[in-house]
Amino acid sequence: MVFGEFFHRPGQDEELVNLNVGGFKQSVDQSTLLRFPHTRLGKLLTCHSEEAILELCDDYSVADKEYYFDRNPFLFRYVLNFYYTGKLHVMEELCVFSFCQEIEYWGINELFIDSCCSSRYQERKEESHDKDWDQKSNDVSTDSSFEESSLFEKELEKFDELRFGQLRKKIWIRMENPAYCLSAKLIAISSLSVVLASIVAMCVHSMSEFQNEDGEVDDPVLEGVEIACIAWFTGELAIRLVAAPSQKKFWKNPLNIIDFVSIIPFYATLAVDTKEEESEDIENMGKVVQILRLMRIFRILKLARHSVGLRSLGATLRHSYHEVGLLLLFLSVGISIFSVLIYSVEKDEHKSSLTSIPICWWWATISMTTVGYGDTHPVTLAGKIIASTCIICGILVVALPITIIFNKFSKYYQKQKDMEVDQCSEDPPEKCHELPYFNIRDVYAQQVHAFITSLSSIGIVVSDPDSTDASSVEDNEDAYNTASLENCTGK
């Protein structure tokens, strides 16, 4: 008998409802079920046709007036106890998810769980949710790693059908997998060094010490570094493109698109500078050149090819669009509310710079994100109170989705690290040798042939097998052992 269960004995004049739940039969008063008319059994009593009854139960016997449900009879005892007592009780040995699904089927809300069981029930449910999420994340990580390994092997198989397949295969592996060998590591280090040098050169370009009066770079060293970096990026992209097993899949890789975008500004700027235009278009062409030069900042994204953290960040943002959208929604609502409030109390102050709602939007944005530039600030007491509330709300609003995003980032980062460890621990594809093949019959024939040859060499000839005595058998065994030892020594 489950906790709190007791069987109600109806009087003779009371009409009963016959229930059959997975073989467990029970007769219940109609008045007991009608206490909760929004549950499945309560709705069952209000049905006026057999079709409506069969929508709520699995079968119905007109002769016996029995309703059949293909459900767990053990869990139904807890449901039946709820109709008698008005409270749900959850035993420790029950699965919380199974119990939750069962009461959801019967139309019973979790709010009916008694106070003695509700706290523990919610704790177990949250623990199960966390474990289930971790398990799914691990399964996804394992499946993704397996799929990526399978795709890598399939890509290697394609080289056998291509022209210069073996050469392209060696180049492609060294360009894509820095952990493959020493030369692959040197290529990765060189590429990373060139990216960093290009970023440093781009920053130095903006310094006035290296520019002439027209704002152009007037330093041959910086120009040489820029040309050398672009030559490296172009050559690297061309080699990857030529060695790739599939040109279509090559351009679907975001990292390859970043490589292509990083070199476009240089060649576009070069084409614009060499093109002769009329005086009217010089100003417009200059603006285009400036924009193209600013696009060189995309080179910094090339670091994602060599950085586990950047790749994990990209995967996290790609799979956390819901949380990021929720964060932007919270901030937008808060900015709209506090900008109007601060404008209403600061607009009449002459010393205040918060004289329009767009300016108040800017102030609310930097306040809710806890940046606080200090260029605009309230001067009235009411404005300072609103500002304090805005900052506190900003901390709370930003902190809510950030935790979820951080957990996902940790998962993807660990996944990327595990994949790198797997790549380093596995033998390179070219170094994997097949297991040696042995034919037992051939090996046995060779051993017998060597044994007969050794017998002939020491003068032992067996003419008649029936005349063989014990001493000859012992001699044969000694000879066999000697021959086997010589054969093993020779090998």
Swiss-Prot record:
Keywords: Cell membrane, Ion channel, Ion transport, Membrane, Potassium, Potassium channel, Potassium transport, Transmembrane, Transmembrane helix, Transport, Voltage-gated channel. The keyword Membrane applies. It comes from the Eukaryota. A motif (Selectivity filter) lies at residues 370-375. The chain crosses the membrane at residues 183-204, 221-243, 255-275, 286-306, 322-343, 385-413. GO terms for molecular function: voltage-gated potassium channel activity. It is a multi-pass membrane protein. GO terms for cellular component: cytosol; Golgi apparatus; voltage-gated potassium channel complex. It is found in: Cell membrane. InterPro entries: BTB/POZ_dom, Ion_trans_dom, K_chnl_volt-dep_Kv, K_chnl_volt-dep_Kv5/Kv9, SKP1/BTB/POZ_sf, T1-type_BTB, VG_K_chnl, Volt_channel_dom_sf. Pfam families: BTB_2, Ion_trans. Residues 358-369, 370-377 dip into the membrane without crossing it. Residues 205-220, 276-285, 344-357, 378-384 are extracellular. The transmembrane segment S4 functions as a voltage-sensor and is characterized by a series of positively charged amino acids at every third position. Channel opening and closing is effected by a conformation change that affects the position and orientation of the voltage-sensor paddle formed by S3 and S4 within the membrane. A transmembrane electric field that is positive inside would push the positively charged S4 segment outwards, thereby opening the pore, while a field that is negative inside would pull the S4 segment inwards and close the pore. Potassium channel regulatory subunit that modulates the delayed rectifier potassium channel activity of KCNB1 by namely slowing down the deactivation and inactivation time constants. While it does not form functional channel on its own, it can form functional heterotetrameric channels with KCNB1. Belongs to the potassium channel family. S (TC 1.A.1.2) subfamily. Kv9.3/KCNS3 sub-subfamily. Heterotetramer with KCNB1. Does not form homomultimers. This is Delayed-rectifier potassium channel regulatory subunit KCNS3. It comes from Mus musculus.
